[in-house]
């Protein structure tokens, strides 16, 4: 039996990143809502508890509290942001409004020598004080520490940015160690999980496969499962995992909705039928999808339509299976959190995902989502462990709605064809261009990345079709054609992302080829927006 860390979610958009950091330390953890019962906490028997942040205010909301059992267990507890504030209130301290709210980068000074922060710093002041570069996001602050606590960290505008009761193993920080912006955040969380809580680092992907296979078999029994293949990483890994568990009880349905990447259909069929020997049904539903999308410009409406049509196609195929009771999807954690679908239901909705929203209550199939609690990097690791080829596992993510969310506004077949070809050219240039020593010298990549393709050095890259026309000149004639935007980002978790600093020569070749080879596009632009404030996909 694995040691476990219990993460209590108060509704933060980045709670799942806490779980990701804990799992990176090879310790099993689960996220549960903050209002679980005392009996649940005791039966879970965690080695330690982490209290997440929240968009709520501890000062205003007296309902979002940790169960009393958390404080009765006698195990270490780490409070993060709101978690620090509720720890303070529940143990006898005070929280107050902050005159100087902190959102973004901050430098925190460590105080004393606590087990949590001892030896962890980014730099030291001339006076010898250890300093941490962190990410803050709070409007309230702890004004008075509970009895037994000592000051652990501070900033000029937040005098109590960290506190500790070492005797009981209670620690709290006002900043967010789970996000990549906090440089030493991973070390801090590992220190709490491994050293303070004493959890054994024995949870590995091989164990997850065995546990997931057992769960799938127990859930499904002898019933049949239908799964929609999009050609993306998530649905492919989900299919391989379910096929490992139940074999021919799984039927994969590959739906051509007219919004696929270039040669997508052939690649998927060759992979799953030819290499994995899975049952695959190929359905050409492009007329159905494009017909329902005609005249629809709102991105949320488009996503709902695509999700609805997927359900209809799956239901039609399921009726052909005598024992089909389950609809499987490649839903992963970022899909769930961006849809406001965290277990607490408190997170704010950013945009709906067709995997999570759009499924009507009248759906005649039960839902199977074996990847729902995994992050993208964990999904890739799982795919490798399952024996999937690298060209599939490390392919860039592709949204379930396909090119439908990469064509701004109304979706038309002609638009999809232009975008398909432009996207293929961009990806071809990324795959064919290797990072050079000059790129490293210019700061575009690390020296250790020289020789790798720019496709491998970016986390996601694609073209976007803009339904606006611009004037151009080709040969001796005037053109008035559409605009394509290129998007490439680098990220570790897909919750935050930086735009990729690609070499100008690469962008120039991609632009020239698209304009010359894709008749109908005469201008190419590059997206230099990060996430946040922008999302990775344009819609």
Swiss-Prot record:
Class in the EC hierarchy, top level: ligase
Reactions listed under catalytic activity: XMP + L-glutamine + ATP + H2O = GMP + L-glutamate + AMP + diphosphate + 2 H(+)
This protein's UniProt keywords: ATP-binding, Glutamine amidotransferase, GMP biosynthesis, Ligase, Nucleotide-binding, Purine biosynthesis
Gene3D superfamilies: 3.30.300.10, 3.40.50.880, HUPs
Pathways per UniProt: Purine metabolism; GMP biosynthesis; GMP from XMP (L-Gln route): step 1/1
Residues the entry annotates as binding ATP: 230-236
Residues the record marks as active site: 81 (nucleophile), 176, 178
GO molecular function: ATP binding; GMP synthase activity
Function (record text): Catalyzes the synthesis of GMP from XMP.
Protein name as catalogued: GMP synthase [glutamine-hydrolyzing]
Organism annotation: Burkholderia mallei (strain ATCC 23344)
Name of the coding gene: guaA
């Amino acid at each position: 039996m694995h040691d476990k860390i219990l993460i209590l979610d108060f509704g933060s958009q980045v709670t799942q990143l806490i779980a990701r950091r804990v799992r990176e330390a090879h310790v099993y953890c689960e996220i549960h809502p903050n209002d679980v019962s005392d009996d649940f906490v005791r039966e879970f028997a965690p080695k330690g508890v982490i209290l997440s942040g929240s968009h709520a205010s501890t000062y205003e909301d007296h309902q979002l509290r940790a169960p009393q059992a958390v404080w009765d267990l006698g195990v270490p507890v780490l409070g993060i942001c709101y978690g620090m504030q509720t720890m303070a209130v529940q143990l006898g301290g005070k929280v107050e409004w902050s005159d100087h709210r902190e959102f973004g980068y901050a430098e925190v000074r460590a105080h004393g020598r606590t087990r949590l922060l001892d030896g962890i710093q980014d730099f030291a002041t001339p006076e010898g004080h250890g300093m941490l570069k962190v990410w803050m996001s709070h409007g309230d602050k702890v004004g008075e520490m509970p009895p037994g606590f000592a000051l652990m960290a501070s900033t000029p505008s937040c005098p109590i940015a960290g506190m500790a009761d070492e005797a009981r193993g209670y620690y709290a920080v006002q900043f967010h160690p789970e996000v990549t912006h906090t440089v030493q955040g991973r070390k801090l969380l590992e220190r709490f999980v491994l050293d303070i809580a004493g959890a054994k680092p024995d949870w590995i992907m091989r164990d997850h496969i065995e546990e997931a296979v057992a769960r799938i078999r127990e859930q499904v029994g002898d019933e049949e499962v239908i799964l929609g293949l999009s050609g993306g990483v998530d649905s492919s890994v989900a299919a391989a995992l379910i096929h490992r568990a139940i074999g021919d009880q799984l039927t994969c349905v590959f739906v051509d909705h007219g919004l696929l990447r270039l040669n997508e259909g052939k690649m998927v069929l060759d992979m799953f039928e030819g290499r994995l020997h899975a049952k695959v049904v190929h359905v050409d539903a492009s007329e159905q999808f494009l017909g329902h999308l005609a005249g629809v410009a709102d991105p949320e409406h488009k996503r709902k339509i695509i999700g609805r049509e997927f359900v209809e196609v799956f239901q039609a195929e399921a009726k052909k299976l005598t024992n089909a009771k389950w609809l499987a999807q490649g839903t992963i954690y970022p899909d769930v959190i961006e849809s406001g679908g965290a277990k607490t239901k408190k997170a704010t909705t950013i945009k709906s995902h067709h995997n999570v929203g759009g499924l009507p209550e009248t759906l005649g199939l039960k839902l199977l989502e074996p990847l729902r609690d995994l992050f993208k990097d964990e999904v890739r690791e799982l795919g490798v462990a399952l024996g999937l080829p690298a060209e599939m596992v490390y392919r860039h993510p592709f949204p379930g709605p396909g090119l439908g969310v990469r064509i701004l506004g109304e979706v038309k077949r002609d638009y999809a064809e232009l975008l398909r070809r432009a996207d293929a050219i961009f990806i071809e240039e990324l795959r064919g261009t290797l990072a050079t020593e000059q790129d490293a010298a210019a700061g575009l990549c690390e020296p250790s990345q020289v020789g790798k393709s720019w496709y491998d050095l970016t986390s996601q890259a694609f073209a976007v079709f803009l339904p606006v026309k611009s004037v151009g000149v080709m040969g001796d004639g005037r053109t008035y054609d559409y605009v394509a935007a290129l998007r490439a980002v680098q990220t570790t978790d897909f919750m935050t992302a930086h735009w990729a600093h690609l070499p100008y020569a690469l962008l120039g070749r991609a632009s020239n080829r698209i304009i010359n080879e894709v008749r109908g596009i005469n201008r190419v632009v590059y997206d230099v927006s990060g996430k946040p404030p922008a999302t990775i996909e344009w819609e």
